[in-house]
Amino acid sequence: MNRKSRILKMLTKTGLVVLAIVFCYPVLFLLTGSFMGQSELSENLGSVMGEATRYARWNFLPQNPTLKHYIEVLLDSPEYFVMFWNSIKVVMGTLVGQCTIAIPAAWGFAVYKFKFKKSLFFLYIIIMMMPFQVTMLSNYLILKQLKLLDTLASLIFPGIFSTFPVFIMFNFFRGIPPAVIEAARIDGAREWDIFLKIGIPLGKGGIIASLVLEFLEYWNLIEQPMTFLNDKTKWPLSLFLPAIRGENVGFAFAVSVITLIPAALVFFAGHEYLEQGIASLGVKE
């Protein structure tokens, strides 16, 4: 490796470290703020909270660490746990439904040939690219006709038929060598057995990657529950933080940290499969 290459490699690593610090800063900000007392937060963020005119400042080591905000969230906020279990129900219901619908759909697109296959898959891609604001009205009217508004099913039902997990899993299933499938057919394996014993084991990377991504998406729903739910007892955890009053900064920090933990655990548990899923997103026909 010549001198120019070493310098370029060093600059690249330095740039990546700087980016990592920038992206980690909000997490460190939340974590340290959650252990600060209200007086210290007011002193540091007085200008942001409208209590002072000087510039805001921040200390990464709390002067007087306290667990007060965590105790308040975990022991004095029953509505937090109601919303937490609402989020669990929504996420688990959506993921189970997606496994039931998306895995066979992705396998069908990847393995079988049928009329209008490319056109139908192209339609899937178009729907996947549409933001929620485009489909919001149609979803609302359908859910109203089905009498699902103001229920957790109004969040679960549209998510079950999401096209995104189909797209992720399709790219993994498509990577299975056709010779393997043909050999199984020659040996007398039924199509269902091929799907269960070859497709799912070899495509588990795509399945797990899509489940991780969908967990992160539905754990952080904002617009859908605000649109489809009027009963606040049905709200998911993602709407708890916006409902906190501005002066309860420490409480908001603690809520943010606790809410972040499940998402972080899921991400780190499936990050290897997630990397494989992102690498497989190139569409080939």
What are these regions (language model features)?
Residues 2-285:
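A structural signal for multi-pass alpha-helical bundles of membrane permease subunits
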